[in-house]
Amino acid sequence: MASANTRRVGDGAGGAFQPYLDSLRQELQQRDPTLLSVAVAVLAVLLTLVFWKFIWSRKSSQRAVLFVGLCDSGKTLLFVRLLTGQYRDTQTSITDSSAIYKVNNNRGNSLTLIDLPGHESLRLQFLDRFKSSARAVVFVVDSATFQREVKDVAEFLYQVLIDSMALKNTPAFLVACNKQDIAMAKSAKLIQQQLEKELNTLRVTRSAAPSTLDSSSTAPAQLGKKGKEFEFSQLPLKVEFLECSAKGGRGDAGSADVQDLEKWLAKIA
């Protein structure tokens, strides 16, 4: 019965091509072994092109830019400024907001900006919902209160980066240091340095914690290079920093300082 089943399977679509493939292989081997090597090389190139076409088409379908951050980081106002250019009073939300954003480049591309809730009980839940469509992540930081919130910021950033490392599309990643119009705001360089220190501490703490994984579970991803002080450059995805201000330097009616953010969005679109 096994041989009969095998014959029936071979007589299908695959079996129809088998005699042709066998004769082609024999002919190539008889004529010149080098010819067979060339044929294999050409086939490898074709398979590589098909693979990259698949990756590119998948990347093209991912048009979402996720705005994440702690509550009161100013990400919702940043979201509104990019879309309308206007100031608007905002409040903490328990759901997401999304809109099409026309990027400022010669290609006329568009992105879908998605503002995710910053509340601690909701932010990871919404990140899970939208991460598969993410072309980019904008992690918004309140530069004015960063010094006292650095541990909370680093904790959330750690969770996002660990999750992003598991994503196959490795989204573009930006830390937007917002509220630069406030006198006590920390610079993007200082924020980067302090976050690297905090993330290094978190990494050591997490790795030293007792594991609760059973034999069927997957070990958590390692953030950065083992045995070295953590730096963002060690990650498989590129993390960039820039300074911005959603409110603007002249009060509510003032124009926002979001030009660098607009340029970054145009670059990754």
Curated annotation (Swiss-Prot):
Belongs to the SRP receptor beta subunit family. Keywords: Endoplasmic reticulum, GTP-binding, Membrane, Nucleotide-binding, Phosphoprotein, Receptor, Transmembrane, Transmembrane helix. The modification Phosphoserine is found at S110. Pfam families: SRPRB (PF09439). One of its GO terms (biological process) is protein targeting to ER. Heterodimer with SRPRA. It comes from Rattus norvegicus (Rat). GTP binds at residues 69-77, 90-93, 118, 246. It is a single-pass membrane protein. One of its GO terms (molecular function) is GTP binding. The keyword Endoplasmic reticulum applies. It is found in: Endoplasmic reticulum membrane. The chain crosses the membrane at residues 35-55. This is Signal recognition particle receptor subunit beta. Its main location: endoplasmic reticulum. GO terms for cellular component: cytoplasm; cytoplasmic microtubule; membrane; signal recognition particle receptor complex. Component of the signal recognition particle (SRP) complex receptor (SR). Ensures, in conjunction with the SRP complex, the correct targeting of the nascent secretory proteins to the endoplasmic reticulum membrane system. May mediate the membrane association of SR.
